[in-house]
């Protein structure tokens, strides 16, 4: 049971109401930076394990 389009739309509407139109671009930017840092951390973590073997 994945998220359907209607569920995604409802979640986005709730986020829009909570943060408002003015703050939403900043929230999305911070989220994107956090996801990029997380992916980079996973990539770095995996390469360290390969070097130790």
UniProtKB/Swiss-Prot annotation:
Oligomeric and partner information: The Tat system comprises two distinct complexes: a TatABC complex, containing multiple copies of TatA, TatB and TatC subunits, and a separate TatA complex, containing only TatA subunits. Substrates initially bind to the TatABC complex, which probably triggers association of the separate TatA complex to form the active translocon.
InterPro entries, per database record: TatA/B/E, TatA/E
Domain of life (superkingdom): Bacteria
This protein's GO CC annotations: TAT protein transport complex
Function comment: Part of the twin-arginine translocation (Tat) system that transports large folded proteins containing a characteristic twin-arginine motif in their signal peptide across membranes. TatA could form the protein-conducting channel of the Tat system.
Disulfide bonds: none
One Pfam family per UniProt: TatA_B_E
Keyword hit for Transmembrane: yes
Entry keywords, A to Z: Cell inner membrane, Cell membrane, Membrane, Protein transport, Translocation, Transmembrane, Transmembrane helix, Transport
Name the record gives this protein: Sec-independent protein translocase protein TatA
Transmembrane regions listed in the UniProt entry: 1-21
Keyword Oxidoreductase carried by entry: no
Recorded topology in the membrane: Single-pass membrane protein
Annotated Gene3D superfamilies: 1.20.5.3310
Gene Ontology MF terms in the entry: protein transmembrane transporter activity
Annotated family: Belongs to the TatA/E family.
Compartment list: Cell inner membrane
GO BP annotation list: protein transport by the Tat complex
Primary location class: membrane
């Amino acid at each position: 049971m994945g998220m359907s389009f209607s569920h995604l739309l409802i979640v986005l509407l709730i986020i829009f109401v909570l943060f408002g139109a003015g703050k939403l671009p900043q929230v999305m930017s911070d989220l994107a930076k956090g996801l990029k840092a997380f992916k980079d951390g996973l990539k770095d973590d995996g390469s360290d394990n390969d070097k130790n073997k």
